[in-house]
Amino acid sequence: MKRSVLTIILFFSCQFWHAFASSVLAIDYGTEWTKAALIKPGIPLEIVLTKDTRRKEQSAVAFKGNERIFGVDASNLATRFPAHSIRNVKELLDTAGLESVLVQKYQSSYPAIQLVENEETTSGISFVISDEENYSLEEIIAMTMEHYISLAEEMAHEKITDLVLTVPPHFNELQRSILLEAARILNKHVLALIDDNVAVAIEYSLSRSFSTDPTYNIIYDSGSGSTSATVISFDTVEGSSLGKKQNITRIRALASGFTLKLSGNEINRKLIGFMKNSFYQKHGIDLSHNHRALARLEKEALRVKHILSANSEAIASIEELADGIDFRLKITRSVLESLCKDMEDAAVEPINKALKKANLTFSEINSIILFGGASRIPFIQSTLADYVSSDKISKNVNADEASVKGAAFYGASLTKSFRVKPLIVQDIINYPYLLSLGTSEYIVALPDSTPYGMQHNVTIHNVSTIGKHPSFPLSNNGELIGEFTLSNITDVEKVCACSNKNIQISFSSDRTKGILVPLSAIMTCEHGELSSKHKLGDRVKSLFGSHDESGLRNNESYPIGFTYKKYGEMSDNALRLASAKLERRLQIDKSKAAHDNALNELETLLYRAQAMVDDDEFLEFANPEETKILKNDSVESYDWLIEYGSQSPTSEVTDRYKKLDDTLKSISFRFDQAKQFNTSLENFKNALERAESLLTNFDVPDYPLNVYDEKDVKRVNSLRGTSYKKLGNQYYNDTQWLKDNLDSHLSHTLSEDPLIKVEELEEKAKRLQELTYEYLRRSLQQPKLKAKKGASSSSTAESKVEDETFTNDIEPTTALNSTSTQETEKSRASVTQRPSSLQQEIDDSDEL
């Protein structure tokens, strides 16, 4: 098999690779918890945080009227509305309708949740939310994915289309297909389905180097839904990446084992049963059909389990569990371990299965790397330590995040968006695919532990007994997954004119998803002699083999047409309907969020308005109508908000907000203007006075032409005169503007909008200061000295001064302060009394 070099990021940040780079989102959809990791070009890998900044979210969706709730809040809602809190649905992925054993087990744990048949989906089941509303298993999973995608898009500031999904190693094709269809409902592209344990191995390898001799480790994943173990081989091989030869780390999954007997949920069920029996023994009340009480016991069992992972005892306490009776029970770690005594064998069962399939012994295993939330439970760790010795137990990966991080790195390697370090990753299928030839006869289409992408050939003998258009059912882990049909056998038989005919079919699996892929079907003819007409050139060309000139063909092969139909796959129409249903639900969520946001903003504004009503100084700037709105309408709107706000249209909420907000803004504008006006006016007058001082003392220096260059003297005087005129015109216009408007402004009432605004004063003062500074620069500029006869051209060039550029570090205030105190005092007389004489001087400056 030709191996492709897959690449994993080791850099502290991702490197931009091409112009159309896109983000990759890895989702670890777990039975109890979901995690997600985002890789975007230009930023390092990040765990996607929830709305509450948690690094993981419960895999739950709840419905409360038109409201859809996710995560911990959705799980907590089960104590009030147990029928509408959908959780732990990953346990149902291997179902084939309501008769499935898994469905029966699920409904015994969550009796309030109602399930119905759904023939349009792979899973075959839907959750009933109301008489008018139900959602398929695929749609429920898609909702959680969509929730995390929206969180990731907020982080990435862009749309996300590429996903990588983790799957337990024991997931068969049916379970994988359900996850893929959930992503298809969202119109997302799944780059890969990666084994949880292989993803952990990738994360484990990033900070380590390996020799050329294989090192064998076991990734042991004990989660909420199952416990699995995968034997992983780590070594270094020679290879090339980006055209360069280098040593490359290789990660190969060799074999896996699993059990459903040991999991976080199974331990929860033990605790729930123990607490339920304790309550019955003490009070004689059976809680088996009390849905709310069972949901509360479930929540408390989860809390107690977490406490006992770190402490020797915990107190289970639930107020008014049933019939007004409080429940309180002390549970020790030893009690929990006695409840789980029958799980000890299950703890090591996956390891034994994996080692047996890999043909390895414990002595060849370097370490057992623990992963998964349940791996923290002390009795699981102690059981493993007793079985394989404690020195081989390794806890050096993040038990919650290693899988999703490894999956994100793997996804980055499958795109062109990232510059990455090379790594060879080889995943395997964990159940054989069987091709049924009859009621009791079958052949292995793909053996167990076959690496992804590897081809496997099967041969069907006795061609004459299979018919003209034979169909062969295909199964994986006991579940029928599809039908393989040969189409043109009769035509091929005419070409293959020999007595010993066989049919060879080639199968493989998708290189990144582990899904079965039929490759080809051929008819072989061993030592057959062709009829004369097929010696001429019209014969069907063979795919393999060779021929000789005598007309005999050894191992001749002829292609056969085939079709492969997957069972239970959602039709395009069903996918469109599911996508439309989720889009409608998303729009309802957005409308609800917009409504809630409008209510919150109105409530905040009402509190502010009510505070302003008691501020007499603030109310001086309100006119009678505005005062009425503040005092009356704000109170009325508050009462309306409490009584009718949640049921009212969003438009009515925003209208009330706008009316009150506009009123407050108008009053606040006048209030702020009045507070800042005197300071701004004083600054403006000071700018006028400085300008007047410079303009009043304007003179034209006498530059002797026997000393200075005559042409440059004219240039300097012209620049100075132009600057003087610009400053003078600005001064004259601003002085006149202030004279025309100041009295009117000062006579307006506080409840009227000001005639002169603070922003105008500040802008005019700024412009005056800029022109004053420019004039000072021109005043300090000197003409060139007259060149001496015989002076070198280089000295003349060195003395050249740029026409429009004069570099001087003098600040405007420094230059202005250099004006004599006497001149400054003269200029402080009335600012509005001199413009006429100054204007005449400004006009005269044109003659300079």
UniProtKB/Swiss-Prot annotation:
This is Heat shock protein 70 homolog lhs1. It catalyses: ATP + H2O = ADP + phosphate + H(+). InterPro entries: ATPase_NBD, Heat_shock_70_CS, HSP70_C_sf, Hsp_70_fam. Chaperone required for protein translocation and folding in the endoplasmic reticulum. It comes from the Eukaryota. It is an enzyme of class 3 (hydrolase). GO terms for cellular component: endoplasmic reticulum; endoplasmic reticulum chaperone complex; endoplasmic reticulum lumen. Keywords: ATP-binding, Chaperone, Endoplasmic reticulum, Glycoprotein, Hydrolase, Nucleotide-binding, Signal. Residues 784-848 are annotated as: Disordered. PROSITE patterns: ER_TARGET, HSP70_2, HSP70_3.
